[in-house]
Structure formats: structure tokens, C-alpha cells
Regions:
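Thiamine diphosphate
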Residues: 1-118
């Protein structure tokens, strides 16, 4: 069981693509549009029952939405958190889709991680 928390229009599109790919394989994660980084929706997070929490954001990993979610669940041993976003490195030039894929934000990469870790 898995929930994907996506923050940002492009991240939501990537996460939805991963859900479609997983659905073709019989895996059906929940997908939540997080809509904003702060304040965190504590009520939503407290109600998550899935053991695997995947965040997808069109943002930097350090100090981003996923970092806040990981911090929130740091003491909760029943949850594993995986963050998909941009690493702390120079990102080259190119089309947005190409750059997101290069940074590991492709629907295929997200789906592969989830399929391997559920």
C-alpha cells in the first residue's frame, strides 16, 4: 500500500502518470494533490494509513515539501518516506519534460520505485 503526495502542477501530472503505469500492473496507489507546502495539512498526514509515503515535487529536495513530510514522519516507524524532486546540483538546459526525466522525476522512475518497494 502506498500514497503519493504531489505538490505542484507538473508533479501532479508526473505522479498521475506513475499511477496509470502502476494501474496497468495491478498496483493502485492513492494520489493526493498537496496543493501547498506550508502549513502542512497535519490532519491529512495523521490520517494516512499507507506504510509507504512517496512525495513528488517540482522543487528542490532540500527544504522542500518532501523534507517537511519526512520530518513529520521521522519518529513514525510504521512509515517509509521517499522524496522525488530536484537534487542539490546544477540542472542543465533543455525542455522541462527532459529535465524532469533527467532528475528522476519521470512517471516510469516513480512507478518503478513504488513497484519495487510496496
Amino acid at each position: 500500500r502506498c500514497v503519493i503526495l504531489a505538490c505542484g502542477e507538473r508533479a501532479i501530472a508526473r505522479a498521475a502518470g506513475a499511477c496509470r503505469l502502476l494501474g496497468e500492473r495491478g498496483v493502485f496507489p492513492s494520489l493526493v494533490n498537496a496543493r501547498f507546502v506550508k502549513p502542512l495539512d497535519e490532519e491529512l498526514l495523521a490520517g494516512l494509513e499507507e506504510p509507504l509515503v512517496v512525495t513528488v515535487e517540482d522543487n528542490m529536495l532540500a527544504g522542500g515539501f518532501g523534507s517537511l513530510v519526512a520530518e513529520r514522519f521521522a519518529e513514525d516507524t510504521s512509515k517509509r518516506v521517499k522524496i522525488f524532486g530536484y537534487g542539490d546540483k546544477f540542472i542543465g538546459q533543455g525542455g522541462i519534460d527532459e529535465l524532469m526525466d533527467d532528475c528522476g522525476l519521470s512517471p516510469e522512475a516513480i512507478a518503478a520505485y513504488i513497484e519495487k518497494n510496496i
